[in-house]
Amino acid sequence: NYYIIIMDTNKIINADSIEHLKTLDENVFDSCVTDPPYHLQSIAERFTHSTEAKYGTDGSFQRLSKGFMGKEWDGGDIAFQKDFWQEVYRTLKPGAVLLAFAATRNYHRMAVAIEDAGFEIFDMINWIYGSGFPKRRNLLKPAHEPIVMARKGVNKDLNLDECRVGDEVFDTSKNVRKEAMNKKAVYQLGLKEDYKGTIVKGRWPANIIHSGLDTDWADFFYCAKANKKEKGDTEHPTVKPLDLMKYLVRLVTPENGLVLD
């Protein structure tokens, strides 16, 4: 059983991800930007004042020995299952890019499952922040979350010009050098070889997103963690900030494209 909520531009389907993905057509989505369960710790370890599930004690509301917020969706290892990512792969258009968040200590398990499902992993984005807290005295302070960058088959360009950082004016003639072997001009800002003017598009996007550390991070896209106002009424402790998600969607999705989460 499932139900659908239709908004102006979005549709929310409350259903089992694997089972419902099987009902969708092939080659539908232009990109996938998702924050799947991290499958980390038990509810007892993370939340000492946990209450009984609000709507019941069975099914997806059952308290499990593992699972973020005590929910089955985080107690399971769906993000590590090749079968799940194969369904995501099937519904994406050729050349579509997948961006998926993961925890630092089990990123590799999700990445392997994504690769085994048929995706080509071509990079990783690091979302870096300075507001994390170590869970125990013998652990490092958490300061980043990795994001898998994977592609379905065909190599299509990212929307890099739409995600440039800052608004500095660059004179391309100052960023040209001659290759010693073939004497071809190389423009270090990713510009066309015959372009000789100036632009106001900011710096070339990097595979790092930061949350405002006390240093010179002008070359990287800035995005702080979601604050209390942005979280709204939800009590979920790991809500991703809207600016971060908008940036990622813009990076990998064509104009008027359809995004799978």
Q: Residue locations for each model-derived region?
A:
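Core catalytic lobe of class I
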Residues: 2-260
